[in-house]
Amino acid sequence: MQEVSNHTPMIQQYLKIKSQYPDILLFYRMGDFYELFFDDAKNAAELLDITLTARGKSNGDSIPMAGVPYHAAEGYIAKIVKKGLSVAICEQIGDPSTSKGPVERQVTRIITPATVSEEAFLDSNQDSILVSIYEKNNKYHIAYTSYTQGKIHLINTVTNSSDLKNQILKLSPQEIITNSNSLVEKNIFNKPVKVLEEWYFSNFEAKKHILNSFDNSFANNILNLYKKEQLTVIGSILAYLTNTLKSTPKHISDILLDEDQNILNIDINSRNNLELDNNSKSSLLNIMDKCKTSLGSRLLRRYFKNPTRDLNKISLRHNVIKSFKQHHYFLKIQDILSYINDIERIISRVALGTVKPKDLVSLNSSLEQLPKLKSLLEKINTSEIININNHIHQIDELTKLLNKAIVDNPPMTIRDGGVIKHGFDQELDELRGLKDNSYDFLLKFETLQKQKTGINTLKVGYNRVHGYYIELSKQYADKVPTEYIRRQTLKASERYITDELKAFEDKILSAKEKALAREKLIYDTLLNKVLEYYSQIQQTAASIAKIDVLANFAERAIKLNLNQPKFNKTGKLDIKEARHLAIEQNIDEPFIPNDTLLSTDTYTLEIITGPNMGGKSTYMRQVAQLIFLAYIGSFVPASYADIGDIDTIYTRIGASDDISSGRSTFMVEMTETAYILNNATKKSLVIMDEIGRGTSTFDGLSLAKACAEKFAKIGAMTLFATHYFELTELVNQYPNTKNIHFEAKEYKDNIYFMHKAVAGAAKKSYGIQVAKLAGISKDVLDSAKKNLANLEKGQDKLDTIDQPQQNLQLDQTPQKNHIKERLETIDINSITPIEALNILFELKKTLI
């Protein structure tokens, strides 16, 4: 901290406050500006592209200063928060007119990336998530809150960093807090993690915050229901919110345990590989999200994060989709929904004290749509719709109140008044009347003064510094009445006041102040009245979100030709004419669909061969995406789908170097493969694309074969694409394995991809033809054809290599007996891929 005593009283005050928030930008209120000083000023100037100036001296150097206008601060703060930084708002709480020295100031709120409610700070379609991780005895206890939802969720405890990473990254949090320094050091989330002081994770403090945040009955129920570690992590969130809000987070209305294990699990790598919910235009989420409200878009994202395996829930969703498709009800529903605003976040802003007058207008216009929506839903007689409709609350008394109280186009804030309608409050109308009638008084007063002085150029005016005045040109100085009191001298004129005008000024200014105070009182009373409907509005918001998602699914089903899937418990996966939605949307010609048939009774492993660009990866991805869509309750892109009991989707598709961790492409591939091998079960869907490409041919082939064998033994539903044709021989060893391939046709030295899956193994890989399509020059292609011909004849070396080559055939090496003996000791039916890799390395060393 700077040496305080060497500074002015104002800077001394600033430094004392700043010392409490060393890692946060401090917005220090000075009149109509928020000012920043020292390093904060330098950082803000760069972040916000504002001017860096100076104020006073510190150790002989100018003190850096930057500032933003108070009325425009929200936009600047939003820029900072969206960069993952936090801001402390320091307001003037004392009265400047009575203060001796600097006016009293204190931090009234801390704005962090996950604790914002204002519209400017938020992505309307995404939840703003704060995650807390409490590490104890190598266990991770997790809780999170979506700030404007008003709920805290507990997640089941995890015991390893892989599961922790998948849980946290699936949530896509804006902010992570923890008691664990090791999580910061490991950096497993690739995003900042904030380590809080120990007291945030004190069980004693946790109980205190729970008791302070909820009524006694609910608080005691929570204290009795959850274990010590769960209460501690709940308390850490409440403590953090209390510190940022500078008040108890009363908007938190519930604590939920997300213990439902009946979900389709997909790790973060598989999510990325399948492009489920990333930000790309071709992501499945982007294709499926045509919701009319931000409420619906956020709920759809929650469905994407936790697809349910509860067939009853899925059946209810399917029934609603079918009902919405009948008579095109979804169109009428979506039309109404398009007029409904984000009432969930608006009511949260009311509870948090950050609501704006225009929010109340938006809330009112949304509530006015509910009678039409409820009436339309009553025509659809399904149990799920009836249940949802019962939780849409038609709050007529509130809409009447808001219609009567708030002007149609209110100002941005209540600060300067003009929000409450004329006729709502008699006292306010009378105070405003004094102000509004001032024009008539001033007009009469000016006319009277002109007559009295005989000066027709006399003017009566007003400014904020000097108040009301009578202005006369200096040439009339000899005609100024004796009762005029000089107030201000200008270059060519003089300004005066009279006792009568001064009395009027006092009356008007007093009326303005009283009117503003009265209006603020009415506004606060109105907000308290709105807050009485908090639970009803939150329930209504949740119900509207469900209706929006299901209407969206109905629209997508018709627009994208999706059909209702079936589910079975027999371990069968039967899909006919499946399509890949993203590719289908981005090609001009018709998409070529494909069938898939796997079953625990027949085949669980497909070895897929065929040329690059032939359709192997698309085929595998479309199967995984189709199953995912089925489990979120959507219809699917296939003419028929009967889906077995699948609890997890694993994918190993593509790879690149992980430079930050010092891992090669091959190491990344093997790490992901090991994770799948160690976790896959009979209820898993496994997608493996080109395993073993990142090492030598023999190593890669050996690993790919070992992995395929392992999946055959596990019995997981596996789609295994490869260019190693040797793997097609596995059908002779494992009866639950079958071959399919993607055809290509040659005509006049050109290749044409059929994109159709056919039974059996491919005969060729067509690599040179694909290289031709890619633009490889003719001389290189001719050389490649020659090399290929030599290799196919069984030659050990290419003609272009003249120098002697080491021959690695086992029967010609001195180590022949040792290698043979070692190979004979290996049980290839029980060895793991990693063990196989180690043995290969061991054998290679003996040949060097």
From Swiss-Prot:
<dbReference type="InterPro" id="IPR027417">
    <property type="entry name" value="P-loop_NTPase"/>
</dbReference>
<dbReference type="InterPro" id="IPR007861">
    <property type="entry name" value="DNA_mismatch_repair_MutS_clamp"/>
</dbReference>
<dbReference type="InterPro" id="IPR017261">
    <property type="entry name" value="DNA_mismatch_repair_MutS/MSH"/>
</dbReference>
<dbReference type="GO" id="GO:0006298">
    <property type="term" value="P:mismatch repair"/>
</dbReference>
<dbReference type="InterPro" id="IPR045076">
    <property type="entry name" value="MutS"/>
</dbReference>
<dbReference type="Pfam" id="PF01624">
    <property type="entry name" value="MutS_I"/>
</dbReference>
<protein>
    <recommendedName>
        <fullName>DNA mismatch repair protein MutS</fullName>
    </recommendedName>
</protein>
<dbReference type="InterPro" id="IPR036187">
    <property type="entry name" value="DNA_mismatch_repair_MutS_sf"/>
</dbReference>
<dbReference type="GO" id="GO:0030983">
    <property type="term" value="F:mismatched DNA binding"/>
</dbReference>
<keyword id="KW-0547">Nucleotide-binding</keyword>
<dbReference type="InterPro" id="IPR007696">
    <property type="entry name" value="DNA_mismatch_repair_MutS_core"/>
</dbReference>
<comment type="function">
    <text>This protein is involved in the repair of mismatches in DNA. It is possible that it carries out the mismatch recognition step. This protein has a weak ATPase activity.</text>
</comment>
<dbReference type="GO" id="GO:0005524">
    <property type="term" value="F:ATP binding"/>
</dbReference>
<dbReference type="InterPro" id="IPR007695">
    <property type="entry name" value="DNA_mismatch_repair_MutS-lik_N"/>
</dbReference>
<dbReference type="InterPro" id="IPR036678">
    <property type="entry name" value="MutS_con_dom_sf"/>
</dbReference>
<keyword id="KW-0067">ATP-binding</keyword>
<feature type="binding site">
    <location>
        <begin position="610"/>
        <end position="617"/>
    </location>
    <ligand>
        <name>ATP</name>
    </ligand>
</feature>
<dbReference type="InterPro" id="IPR007860">
    <property type="entry name" value="DNA_mmatch_repair_MutS_con_dom"/>
</dbReference>
<dbReference type="GO" id="GO:0140664">
    <property type="term" value="F:ATP-dependent DNA damage sensor activity"/>
</dbReference>
<dbReference type="Pfam" id="PF05192">
    <property type="entry name" value="MutS_III"/>
</dbReference>
<dbReference type="InterPro" id="IPR005748">
    <property type="entry name" value="DNA_mismatch_repair_MutS"/>
</dbReference>
<dbReference type="Pfam" id="PF05190">
    <property type="entry name" value="MutS_IV"/>
</dbReference>
<dbReference type="InterPro" id="IPR016151">
    <property type="entry name" value="DNA_mismatch_repair_MutS_N"/>
</dbReference>
<dbReference type="Pfam" id="PF05188">
    <property type="entry name" value="MutS_II"/>
</dbReference>
<dbReference type="GO" id="GO:0005829">
    <property type="term" value="C:cytosol"/>
</dbReference>
<dbReference type="GO" id="GO:0003684">
    <property type="term" value="F:damaged DNA binding"/>
</dbReference>
<keyword id="KW-0234">DNA repair</keyword>
<keyword id="KW-0238">DNA-binding</keyword>
<dbReference type="InterPro" id="IPR000432">
    <property type="entry name" value="DNA_mismatch_repair_MutS_C"/>
</dbReference>
<dbReference type="Pfam" id="PF00488">
    <property type="entry name" value="MutS_V"/>
</dbReference>
<comment type="similarity">
    <text>Belongs to the DNA mismatch repair MutS family.</text>
</comment>
<keyword id="KW-0227">DNA damage</keyword>
